[in-house]
A protein has these predicted regions:
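Recognition helix of helix-turn-helix/homeodomain-like DNA-binding domains
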Residues: 1-9, 32-34
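Generic detector of contiguous secondary-structure segments
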Residues: 8-15, 88-99, 200-211
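DNA major-groove recognition helix of helix-turn-helix/homeodomain DNA-binding modules
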Residues: 13-28
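Short acidic/polar N-terminal linker immediately downstream of export determinants
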Residues: 32-89, 117-122, 225, 229-240
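Right-handed parallel beta-helix
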Residues: 49-53, 57, 89-172, 184, ...
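Active-site alpha-helical segments that house and flank conserved acidic catalytic motifs
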Residues: 60-62, 140, 215-217
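A generic structural signal for short beta-strands and their flanking turns/coil linkers
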Residues: 76, 122-124, 192, 213
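Short, surface-exposed interaction patches in beta-rich subdomains
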Residues: 168-261
Length: 261
């Protein structure tokens, strides 16, 4: 068509038909908004969207999940997407509730029809997209096998729950993680503070070889160790660095591992 060839404009009826086919709005079809959201490879999915008109703080309570992705994107809406390859009752058993309260947005994931948190931990994948220009402080409560936080630039992110693996990439923030599980934390890139609060846990934090940071431990009987090429080494933190890693809690250990190039 002339539209595809760049020599004309599309008929609105055709646009509406195409948008309906792909289950997106005409505005999204004409913009690049969807290009930042990878299309799902899952069999079952559910999406909830909400328009935002200004900067907001976010209080997100998800309960159990197999994996959670929290990421910023260039758009106008917050979107909560749920996926599963085995949970065919996804649409009926899980509902996202979004409340807009002045300068705060509350996001709650509610379970119905006796859907259990155990089921969610085995099969439920959640991705939350937040518009870059509207991101305030974020509080996230979740029990998940993996958590990925990507491209978020804000003042503070607080994560509470039971989490086994965390990956941080492209963020500029003060990130606080409160989890009493032994965690594997991977920092691919991050600017700012990373504060880890644990009770009787041993976690490993892997950082790039060229990542400069200063570190400190607080609390009671906490220890930070350092590892390079599979061997324990002396403290290689930099007291003059801007990036900051802190371990707090009781009877906990953090091993900071320099990734092999």
């Amino acid at each position: 068509s002339k539209w595809e060839n760049g020599t004309g404009t599309p008929d609105i009826a055709n646009l509406m038909a195409i948008a309906d086919l792909f289950q997106i709005s005409v505005d999204e079809l004409l913009s690049n908004e969807k290009s930042e959201k990878k299309q799902s490879d899952y069999i079952y999915e559910s999406r909830t969207e909400y328009d935002i008109d200004g900067k907001k703080n976010f209080d997100i309570k998800l309960g159990g999940a197999y994996a959670v992705d929290l990421k910023a994107y260039h758009g106008e809406k917050i979107e909560v997407a749920m996926f599963s390859n085995v949970y065919k009752n996804l649409l009926a058993d899980y509902k996202v509730k979004i409340d807009d309260i002045k300068n705060r947005i509350d996001i709650d994931l509610n379970r119905f029809n006796e859907a259990s948190e155990a089921d969610a931990k085995e099969s439920l994948v959640i991705t939350i997209f937040i518009p870059v220009k509207y991101i305030g402080k974020i509080e996230l409560s979740v029990n998940a096998g993996t958590l990925n936080i990507t491209d978020i630039e804000n003042e503070h992110i607080e994560v509470n729950g039971k989490i086994s693996e965390v990956t941080l990439q492209g963020n500029k923030s003060e990130i606080e993680i409160d989890s009493n599980l032994d965690m594997q934390i991977s920092v691919l890139s991050h600017e700012g503070a990373l504060e880890i609060n644990q009770l009787s846990a041993t976690s490993r934090l892997t950082i790039p070889a060229d990542y400069r940071f200063r570190s400190t431990k607080k609390g009671i009987a906490t220890h930070i160790y350092y590892e390079r090429q599979g061997k324990k080494v002396d403290d290689f933190s930099d007291a003059e660095a801007d990036n900051y890693i802190e371990l707090n809690g009781i009877k906990s250990e953090l091993v900071i591992v320099e990734a092999e190039v």
